[in-house]
Amino acid sequence: MTYAYLNITTPQHNNIFTPPQHNNTSTSYLTTSTSHHNNIFTTPQHNNITHMIYRKLTEDEISTLQANSCWAEDWQRIEVSEDFEPRFFHRVMFYGDIRLGAFTDNVEVSRGFMKHSGVNNATLRNVTIGNNCLIENISGYINNYTIGDDCIISNVCTMETTDGATYGEGNLISVLNEVGEGNLILFHGLTSQVAALMVKHFHNRPLKDTIRRLIREEIERTAPDMAAIGNRVKIVNTKEITNTVIYDDCEIAGAARLSDCTLMSNSNASVYIGTGVICENSIIGDGSSIINSVKMQDCFVGEACK
């Protein structure tokens, strides 16, 4: 199994209040560069799903959807934006509570190749979709997901949020202590400094308990009710995405499985997940690329790692 490696700079000091001297570098099963987060309480910037006013489908809209071979478990549980256009939906099965945005624009699926936004050949259950997304050829289903604006999801088998989802947060791993008790907790605010503090002062029980309590409270405070996909995300030719939060401007092309992960992409430093990648119980920092069939489990990949 291949692991992503992070460089954790270990502070050379005896007192936790002494400024760390970043002179010596140790290698562990994590690799991370220094994050721009200011402290462990920095709230993650989840997708900016457009807040809109929804309404029920009209009888004419239901008739148009049915004429396009769409079916719903209960049409009354589908809510749509004011500018909703049913003619851009074909062969879609709706289950549970559905919310749909406006589908008025074209999207660029490849350089110079434009397709109109809409949903075709898909099964949706308890899904919210933002404006101007293109979702097509979902061979399995999308279940319990919130999808932002201007996304492309094509040729995907399953996307799902299940009970007990962790999104890669709260996992306890061993760093520089492979045969002992886990000494490092993965979470969205992890930095080199916080990691070094947890590892170096692992045997300081009061400090360890306090840090773990603060991290646990932060995870509980920021955990979403269901997995979400940000704006301008592109997911193509991917088999399985389960319990995974995907931030803005991320691209996933040909991945085999993403399970209980957080991809902290943004418009200035996007995350790319390539062909054959299997990633489980991990957090990927902004600007990072995971490619060439990497198999990764219980890892934190820092900013701009490749």
Predicted features, each with a name:
Residues L6, P11-N14, P20-N23, H36-N38, ...:
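Compositionally biased, intrinsically disordered low-complexity segments enriched in Pro/Arg/Gln/His
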Residues S28-K306:
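Domain-scale signature associated with acetyltransferase and cell-envelope carbohydrate enzymes
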Residues T18, T27-S28:
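A periodicity- and composition-biased signal for non-globular, repetitive helical segments
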